[in-house]
Amino acid sequence: MRGLDYKWIEALDAVVAQGGFERAAEELYISQSAVSQRIKQLERFLAQPVLIREQPPKPTPVGKKLLGLYRRVRILEHELIPELMNDDTAKPIQLALATNADSLATWLLPALKEVMTLRQVELNLAIYGESRSIEKLKSGEVAGAISLESQPIAGCKADYLGRMDYVCVASPDFYQRYFAAGVNYQTLRKAPAVSYDQYDDLHNRFLHDHFNISRDSIINHNVGSSEAFVRLAVSGIAYCLIPKLQIEQELASGVLMDITPGFLLSYRIYWHHWQLESGVLKEISQAIVQYAQAHLPQ
């Protein structure tokens, strides 16, 4: 019986990564019909579909498992073959990691600086909410993920990184305009806030836990940039929850103020990665864990 042909999975990976058959064909330097034929051969071999044919195409649950396997093999292959052939001219290894925006805006890049400087690696740092990033590791789309989840998925490890502490801040002018009567249920419902996106529930959780306010009771902007949060708050457009680590200078100078002193939102974050790691991927995991544990509150 013929075994699994990795060219079939390569075609599946290209279709998903490029968002369609035409671009996948260009990526693989084959015809579009050849890409389609390889996908059909894979589905015939497995006796089930591996691709949801919509726009853009998406892998089925079985397709996700195959992509996870394929991408792991590619990483190991990329590291092993140059070593066996004593070839130091190989292309950089490509790695995708899932992170939340706040980690990227604060401590993650300094943690990765040495590895990115010394090793041949191209990183794709994909931003997802803390509760969604683990799904990308399950599907094989990324080789590691920062998550709120403490329990590892099958075949992976979860290392504790530290605590992210959030403070609710605004500019002094904004505070006088909206909170002259104090920060309470009534005033918070009239003041504009900002969240990262519709999946960001940190602000909602904070308001619900401390003021019993629901999301649909407030004025809320969605801005997909942690750095823009700071600018919006400093310019007096909105109030928001921001990692304390990100705005220590603004708090010290008085440009921003903690409008709910004594109320802090904290959560623990974890680095999820494959149990069997080697080479640059192992170095990345070690760098992330060591730096975070040294610089984040424990």
Curated annotation (Swiss-Prot):
GO terms for molecular function: DNA binding; DNA-binding transcription factor activity. Gene3D superfamilies: 3.40.190.290, Winged helix-like DNA-binding domain superfamily/Winged helix DNA-binding domain. The keyword S-adenosyl-L-methionine does not apply. The keyword Cytoplasm does not apply. This is HTH-type transcriptional regulator ArgP. Belongs to the LysR transcriptional regulatory family. Signal peptide: none annotated. Keywords: DNA-binding, Transcription, Transcription regulation. Homodimer. Pfam families: HTH_1, LysR_substrate. Residues 21-40 bind DNA. It comes from Vibrio vulnificus (strain CMCP6). PANTHER family: HTH-TYPE TRANSCRIPTIONAL REGULATOR ARGP (PTHR30579:SF2), TRANSCRIPTIONAL REGULATOR (PTHR30579). Residues 4-60 form the HTH lysR-type domain. InterPro entries: ArgP, ArgP_gammaproteobact, LTTR, LysR_subst-bd, Tscrpt_reg_HTH_LysR, WH-like_DNA-bd_sf, WH_DNA-bd_sf. Controls the transcription of genes involved in arginine and lysine metabolism.
